[in-house]
């Protein structure tokens, strides 16, 4: 029987935690990080009015009205009459030309 050290690691054992993927920022002893990355705080009035910046309006007048019935199915478009009238018949041969061909061929 194989020893416990030789077996493959379980999937649960292999799974990495989320903290493994975070980029580690090097810390320097002589630099205060609070002064480098400090951002001026907004005024208290701005914090109360817009906690997360932009937001979706939730008032009833801003909502899209619900449809009570389904819309009708799309209908097939009709072919315009102009398109049908423009179509010419295909002429394969003209009868007078055929008669002349046979007359000339018979004379030779």
Swiss-Prot record:
Protein origin, superkingdom:
Eukaryota
What function is annotated for this protein?
Probable cyclin-dependent protein kinase (CDK) inhibitor that functions as a repressor of mitosis in the endoreduplication cell cycle.
Keyword set, alphabetical order: Cell cycle, Protein kinase inhibitor
Q: What are the BP-aspect GO terms? A: regulation of DNA endoreduplication
* GO MF annotation, one: protein kinase inhibitor activity
Name of the encoding gene: SMR13
Q: Which organism is it from?
A: Arabidopsis thaliana
- Protein name per UniProt: Cyclin-dependent protein kinase inhibitor SMR13
